Amino acid sequence: MRKKVLATLVPLALAAAYGTGALAQEAAEAPAAPAAPAAAAASGDVAANVDAANTVVVTGFRSSLQKALNLKAQAIGVRDSIVAEDIGKFPESNVAESLQRVPGIILNRDESSAEGQRISIRGLPTEYSVTTLNGAPVNTTSTGSIGSAARGFNYDVFASELFGRVDFYKSPLSELPEGGMGGVVDLQSPRPFDNPKGAVRYSVTGAYNTMSEKTDPAAFGLFSKTWGNWGFLVGAAHSKAMNNRSGFEATGGYNSSARGSKTPVQGNFAMQLDYDDPRANLSGYTRDQVDNALLPRIYRFYGSSNDRSRDGLVSSLQYKDSTLNVSLDTMYSKLKNSRDELYYGILIRNSKTTNPSAPPGTAGHNGLVPIDVHIDPGSNLLTGTFGNTSYSSGVTYSEDETKFSYASLNANWKANDRLSLTGQLSVNSSKAQSYQDTLSGQIFGITSTIDYGSDHVYPSLSSTSDYLNPANYSGFGIGTGLTRETDRGRQGRVIADWDYNLWGEWTGHLKTGLVYVETEKGVHKRNATSDMTTKLNGLGNAGMRQGMVFDLPISNLDMGGGWPHQFGTFTRDYTYSTFDPLAYNTEATFTPAQSFTATEKVTSGFVQSDFKGEVLGHGLRINAGVRYSRTELDIDNFKKTGAGGAYEPNQESGSYHNLLPAISGAFDVTDDLMWRASFGKTISRASLSIIAAQTVVPNPFDNSATAGNPSLRPQQSKNMDTSLEWYFRKGSLLSAAYFRKVLTDATVSSTTQTTFGALGLPDTAMGAIFYGPDGRVDPNLPMTLRTYSNAGRQVLKGYELSYQQDFDFLPAPYKGFGMLASYTHIDPFNSAKWITNAGREIEVNSVPKYAYSTTAYYENGPLAIRFSYNYKGRSLHGDNPKNNGDDLIRWRAARGYLDGNISYKINDNLELRLDALNLSNTLSYDYFEDATGQYGSGKKTRMDYAKYDGRTIKIGLRGKL
């Protein structure tokens, strides 16, 4: 029964979610400087049912869906749109979360806030798409991606109320900016003449998160008014949110003593059980069974609290008459995160006893002793008692901030009925900064009992040692770092549109233009770990123990019943006052291997034409064109030179050009059945982080490094799309699409096993958890080195199914129901083959093989209800793209999210709204599958980064004056 109810409610919500985006607004007027995607829609008739729908006046979700459907039908290529229900009323609080309902889009969430952050399109990574703002390419980053220098776009920087419409293009068009092999997403900001009558909109909301048990405010206000030919719009948004996360971490893998003790190490970390200790007891198992059983890299609890604030401003000054449309648009956004993280558990990686006379638990005498152990059916050694265990109690306190600003001057002049000229000048800037301290202490050489239990997310841990005695803690360590990433862009374009007649009733629309885009990305890193370590050593164990507290610095953490709820740790106030990360890192020497500035200058020209007419009484629309671009790249970085390996300033430059043809067609098979097809060539440029940077450690608390390659070529793709779209009723669509991309020169990664000493990096490249008692990183520490190169030919293909229907044919009171659903399937696509130790090839997929989204809604009079469910399948984890010798495949587990909202119009000017996010309280986690099939999938027995985010409930008022 519950499944039947859910199956009914879920579809109802999807249409609503989409609906809020596209329904209540009048068809948006062409912006003063039409976004490249916006201009691609063909003028002309669409399917009969779509035309008929335009004559029906509806509001709310249904109206939004209908407008999005109209835009899709009018386009010649493959385009989907989400339109604000009304000015300042976008479907979701986050643009990326609205986009995930579009077939082919898979959402990537920020791990700290659980908000939608980036999107991947049709199986391609996030940096394979281009995001534009009113047609101009923009870049920005936030939270965990600061310093990655990727080309992707972080949507969580912006409040969705700042936008009026989003267009998403999957098929190539000559007018679209190059670089988006996956697609182009165009964000369009509102302008006053979008609603010439003027508007004053506002909303106030309180949000409660069940994990943090905190309530946070959000507010939005917008004023828009026109005076004759002049108009002005200004809007502001503010929100706060506090989210807690908690669960189990293995921190990157599982391994056995048999493989971890080999030279070189098999698996992703070294470890060796100590069978020579007199306490060793195999509990009835053979030595071989225990030796081959799997243990996690670290067995620990993780908890975090992320305090996020976001502020945004949007404005537009517009002049519009019958021939001239000029606007000055601006946007500003600031995103701040204060993140508190704590962890407590047993260190298993790099544990080995070679010197029994050393203090128990310290380097050389830290091999775990099996005393009373149990091996589960998956050959995991996750229950039992072990001697000589060492605990690490750590905290990381982080601050990150992103400031984005944008200004654009746009003009459109209608010279006559056939010719119009458009010009745009825009600038944008994104400045992001992140800094943090990680402070830890250890308890060495004690006996512990662990039990993975049935929950696995909150296992148990106990010991005879006193966790509350500060004298038991020593081996204190500190790690820190500061990263700044900047993006600056300048863009100018001039475009001419000309309508012309062809033979018979055929007409054409020619568009040609010149575009110049200059972008600069800089990454600047500093690390004061050595200076802080000097101070820590000066304080000594006694001084550090005085700074410890035993009540956890993060409140309301769900830890389960079997984990210690009190242990020695450090507060944010103590950590920052004793080791001020901003002061220390600002004065520290910058990290040359990870710092660079790269400038790209792209000059492009394009010409394309739409052709519209009939063939045998059936409508046919064609768009054909070509785009030429020349790219110049200048890099300023630092390179090792000479026998001493010192870093010296280095400059590199290069250029290349591309010719990118594209053709699309839409054919009306019947009045309500449309066939589309498109062919074209696109490119994507490799991430600047792997072009401009030297050998770096992206995550100082993970033993993996990345080496850049300045010789990488841009990746190219030849694309084919075809689809059938059946507009079978007003407000309804059933469609099926097939896509195929042939990629050449794709950027692929390969990994090799090496040691930290062989990388030639300073100790400060690694986090404090890797430091020995001497304050240094062991040069023999196993490291995974990832390098990049251009691959040969690869093929990516898949299909998409989409369904949308307004059930207005039902009798009252069921007439208000509607549904929206989509399904995407991507054939397994991975650049590297996954080979078992026995030589068998395993089919793996680097992106989810399938994803689906469904929304059901009900709208009747003042009441509207919506539920949405979005699901994506499992995918190969990028940190473990191939076999490390342990036959374990690391998967990102499949996951689905259920959201809902209820709104009630108190009157025409005021609406009460209730939103519920992540109603399913979805568990996000990785797991390690045994590729041989002998020890099971590991889906519930070898989990990693398994955490709950909790549910968020929002209640608020939205109104207009």
Label every model-predicted segment.
Residues 57-93, 118, 141-143, 147:
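N-terminal periplasmic "start-of-domain" segments of outer-membrane beta-barrel proteins
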Residues 96-141, 170:
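Extracytoplasmic beta-strand/coil segments of soluble accessory domains associated
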Residues 145-153, 161-168, 175-273, 307-312, ...:
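Outer-membrane beta-barrel translocator/receptor signature
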Residues 176, 192-198, 228-230, 323, ...:
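Short loop/turn motifs that connect adjacent beta-strands in outer-membrane beta-barrel proteins
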Residues 261-296, 358-389, 448-476, 524-594, ...:
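Flexible glycine-rich, low-complexity coil/linker segments exposed to the extracellular/periplasmic environment
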Residues 402, 594-600, 685-743, 764-771, ...:
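Outer-membrane beta-barrel signature, preferentially recognizing the C-terminal barrel domain
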Residues 742, 750-752, 759-879:
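Gram-negative outer-membrane beta-barrel transporters
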Residues 742-744, 871-882, 903-961:
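C-terminal beta-signal and adjacent terminal beta-strands/loops
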